[in-house]
């Protein structure tokens, strides 16, 4: 690091089990909601756990073109949507040096739904049926990279996988 600089958060966005925007999430938190409900994203018949905190009512096509939706894992779709909300919320307009914009994005694991889908294809149909986009869609840094490309951020781009 050549010099110390301040970091300024100019906007926020949120895709959560409590809502698909900051305002919806905040209102539901204030009203004591927890976002927990019956799991719908997979069959829970063989599991003891039947409850989870899923994001509901999210339409990735509100933020991505159809071809982008097809080649982007759900976790990255959430990230792109929240980042777009944050950019919109920021009110930043005009000529801003792309080198001064950074993306630091945290996730728990990356594209686990892509991993599951492609693993099933591998087992049931063989390696030739696995998507060539398998690795790019599931890696933990795909969300940060996609956000950076969409918003021409040329500063640091760092995934924080916990």
Where are the predicted features?
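Conserved "HGTGT" condensation-loop signature of ketosynthase/thiolase-family condensing enzymes
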Residues: 1-157
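Short beta->alpha junction loops
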Residues: 159-162
């Amino acid at each position: 690091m050549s010099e110390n600089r301040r970091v300024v958060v100019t906007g926020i966005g949120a895709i959560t089990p409590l809502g698909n925007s900051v305002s919806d999430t905040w209102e539901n938190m204030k009203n004591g909601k927890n976002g927990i409900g019956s799991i719908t994203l997979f069959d829970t018949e063989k599991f003891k756990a039947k409850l989870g905190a899923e994001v509901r009512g999210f339409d990735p096509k509100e933020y991505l073109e159809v071809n982008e939706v097809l080649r982007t894992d759900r976790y990255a779709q959430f990230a792109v949507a929240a980042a777009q909300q944050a950019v919109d919320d920021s009110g930043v307009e005009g000529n801003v040096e792309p080198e001064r914009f950074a993306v630091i994005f945290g996730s728990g694991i990356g594209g686990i739904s892509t991993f599951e889908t492609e693993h099933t294809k591998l087992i049931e149909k063989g390696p030739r049926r696995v998507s060539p986009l398998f690795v790019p869609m599931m890696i933990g840094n795909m969300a940060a990279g996609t956000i950076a490309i969409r918003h021409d951020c040329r500063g640091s781009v760092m995934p924080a996988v916990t």
